[in-house]
Amino acid sequence: MKNKLINTLAFVGIALISTACSQNTQSQVQQPNETPDKPWSVKMVESEMARWPESWQLDFQPKLKWDYCHGLELQAMLDVYDRYGDDKIYEYALAYADTMVNADGTIKMYKREEFSLDRVNSGKFLFRIYEQTKDEKYKKALALMRSQFEDHPRNEDGGFWHKKIYPNQVWLDGIYMGAPFYAEYAFRNNEVGVYQDIINQFLMAARHTYDPITDLYKHACDVSRKEKWADPVTGQSQHSWGRALGWYAMAFVDALEFIPQHEAGRDSMIITLNKVAQQIKRLQDEKTGLWYQVLDRSGDEGNYLESSCSVMFVYTLFKAVRKGYVDPSYLAVAEKGYKGVLEHFITTDDKGMISITKACAVAGLGGKNYRMGDYDYYINEQIRDNDPKAVGPFIMASLEWERLQEVRKIVNN
């Protein structure tokens, strides 16, 4: 209750600032001009539950899978449940948890020995499932995933490999997949000794992927410089992929709230987050408020405005402003981006179901069907509607937007 009050008071202050500045920014940022009969976050959750009646079907799955997309979207759905209620949402998330987690705490389709950070993100929503049910199997499942970090392969500077099959590689995606779970587990279980390890994951990734020429973070880095996709000098991949930076950005705002303010290195995390925020602001498309699939080739032929990175950036900036990590001026960037998402990516069918369009289905580096990570690769990967990697962050961004509107009503009244 105390933390909620502090956050509300802080956001009221931000709302006062943004209201006072509204006359100056009116020409730049318009309010989203369509108000649904329900909050956008609720409409998207209801639409997804209608599209995929069984929660294991999320991410277009024909069979059971322990997948980071399920964790992402179900976490967002539980955020909606926490804010607006509706037991159907909770039961939907619980059904996946109950199906996938066995009575002894083992998890179907989860293989610890694969050392995949992706499989850890799948379990973040279990914290709240355990809180609600007090079923010990969820506590055991959380401990199982936490134990992965004890043996997970690392680079010499302590950075986790993205996966065992990707040795010596740091992917920005992986920071989101592992660090927020690690931080929340540490917070809930009083593991004060691991915060430095968590902070190091963020700062290590920044050191390895930052390109001073473009002033951007590249998708990944092979610290060993052995991969064909890696620059022989820096080890970095060729391009800055929008969603990779989106994952990294969201990881900051989600992990920081669990790291004590006095912890050494936390300030460095916030400095790096501000650097990311500056990049997001600089690369925002002036006309639409959105962001491109390949950030360092924004506006080039074949490149396109992509929904998943756009909603990730919007969510990050909204939350970073609310938490006081970045300057309140970034609120205008977030609002312009959110308006752009509603105008260019959100569609409504004749039944009232909403969809989010134009999301890159997948992008990676190396692997069996070797991916060089060149420009043509990124712009030619499959594009699809209602990809969870866009759906989940859209729900999260919408919740931040809705929270801001409620605070503004309080301020204006």
Language-model region placement:
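Inter-helical turn/loop segments and adjacent helix faces that build the functional surface
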Residues: 84, 185-196, 255-267, 320-328
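Bacterial N-terminal signal peptides that target proteins for export
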Residues: 1-10
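Extracytoplasmic mature domains of secreted/periplasmic and thylakoid-lumen proteins
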Residues: 105, 112, 116-179
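Acidic/His metal-coordination segments adjacent to aromatic residues that form catalytic metal sites
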Residues: 50-56, 101-108, 159-164, 224-238, ...
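Oxyanion-binding "anion nests"
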Residues: 249-298, 302
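CBM-like carbohydrate-recognition segments
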Residues: 29, 33-69, 83-90, 99-117, ...
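C-terminal motif of bacterial Sec signal peptides marking the signal peptidase cleavage site
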Residues: 18-20
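Long, well-ordered core segments of solenoidal/helical folds
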Residues: 37-57, 91-109, 140-159, 192-228, ...
